[in-house]
Amino acid sequence: MLFEEIVIFGCGNPLFADDGFGPEVVEELKKYKLPDNVKVIDAGLGGPHFLFTLMAQSDEPVKKIILIDIADFGGEPGQLARLSVNDLPPGTYRDPHSWGLTEPLHMLKDRIDITIIGCQPKRVTEPDFEIGLSDEVQAAIPKTIQTILDILGVQHGTEGTAFKDLRNEREEGISTIPCSN
C-alpha cells in the first residue's frame, strides 16, 4: 500500500528558520507509537503538490490528511490555527517556491477529510539560510502534537507512546489553539 488511511504531512524547509516547523513536528511525532493506519511524512518543499496529485490519482483509501505548516494568519508568533480547505481561497496557500497548494487541496477535499494546522511564524529567512526555529515556534510543537493526537482520537502516554481512544471529534473552520500547556 502506497499510503495509509490517515496521512500526516509536515511541510516546510528547515533551512529558512520557522519554515522548518512542519518537518520538526514530523520528527517529534515519529517518536510516538501511532495507530497502524497512520502514515507520517516529511513532505519538505514542493513535495506536497506532487504528493497531493499522486494521491488524487491513487486508488488507495486515504481518508484523512493532516497538513502541518507555517501560516501567516496575523496571529502572535507560535500561535496555532486549525483550518479547513474551505478557509483557503484558491491561490492563497503557496509554499516558498511558489507551488500552488490550494488547488490540489480543493481537488481532494470532497473525498478526503483535510485538516491544516498552521503555526504563525516569527521569522522566515528565505533566501538567507538560518537553521533553527524561533523560541515561540519551537514552543508550539508540543501543543501541535497534542492537537494531532486529538484529531486522530488518540491520547498520549507518559513516555512518547500513544494509544487509541474511541472519541470521534471533528471541527470545521478556523479556530486558534492556545499554545500554553
Language-model features, listed with the residues they occupy:
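Nucleotide and nucleotide-moiety/phosphate-recognizing core
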Residues: 3-8, 14-18, 23-85
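A short glycine/serine-rich beta->alpha loop
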Residues: 11-15, 90-91, 130-131
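Conserved active-site and cofactor/substrate-binding residues in soluble primary-metabolism enzymes
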Residues: 20, 24, 45, 96-99, ...
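Glycine-rich loops and low-complexity Gly/Arg-rich segments
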Residues: 32-35, 64-68, 89-93, 106-108, ...
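Helix-loop-strand module that forms the ligand-binding subsite of alpha/beta enzymes
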Residues: 70-114
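Phosphate-binding/catalytic loops
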Residues: 101-181
